[in-house]
C-alpha cells in the first residue's frame, strides 16, 4: 500500500514448505493486549454493539486514532502463515481490517470479546474463503481480490459500479516486482510462480473506479464505516489499488478519510481531510472503490 478473512480452528496451521501442522506462539500472532482491553472497555461504555455495523466500525476506527504506522506487520514468520493482530502498530490495511473485525466481534456476547475471537474474525476477512490454510497465498494480498472474495461471501457489498464507477485497465504485480521486501517470499522463492498466477487471475477481473473528479458528487451517498480503496495510475496508465481507509462522517456532515498514514506523512492513524479533497493531494491517485460492510 502507499509508500513503501469463518473457518478452521485458528491455530491449526500448515507450513508453507511442509505438510505437517505447526503453530506460532500466541505472543507472535497477537500484540497489544493492553490496547485491546482498553478498546473493549470503550466499546462497553459507549454501547457500540447497538450501532449498525458501519457506524460501529467507524467508532472502533476513531478509537484507534493515534496508533503508530508500522510496515509489514503481517510478515511474522519465514514459513507459517497465520491470522495475526498488532495493536501496537498498523498499516493502512490492518487498520481497517482490525476496526471491522473488532466491530463484528461486538455482535457476540461480551464473554466472547477476546483476542482469540478477534483473530477468528480477522481470519474470516483476511483469507480466501475465510480460511487460513497456513499457505502464504491463502491470504488475500490485493485489495481488489479482497473485495471480490468478501463481496462474494456476503460480508461486504461492492458499491463502486452502483455509484458510477467505470471499468479501468489495471494490473496486480506489486508483489512479484518487489518480492525481496516480503519476508515469506524472500525465504520461499518457490512461491513466486504461484503468486504470479494469482496476480494474473486478479488482473483478469474488471476493476471499477469512481474517478476522483466524481467523488464530491457521490460523497453524500457514502456512510461512516464504508471501506474506501484508493486507486492510483502508473506512468503507463494502468491502475492498481494503492491505499485504503474508512469513511467517517463527522457531526458537521463532512465525509472524512480515516486511515493509517505512512511515516512520510503523519506516521499514525488519523482522521484526514474531506475524502474528495484528500484525493487531490497525490497526482497519481485516480479514484476510489467503495465497499460497505454488511455483517
Q: How would you describe each model-predicted region?
A:
Residues 11-19:
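Hydrophobic h-region of N-terminal signal peptides that target proteins for export
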Residues 8-11, 249:
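Intrinsically disordered, low-complexity, compositionally biased regions/tails
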Residues 1-8:
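Bacterial N-terminal signal peptides that target proteins for export
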Residues 19-295:
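Cysteine-nucleophile amide-bond enzymes
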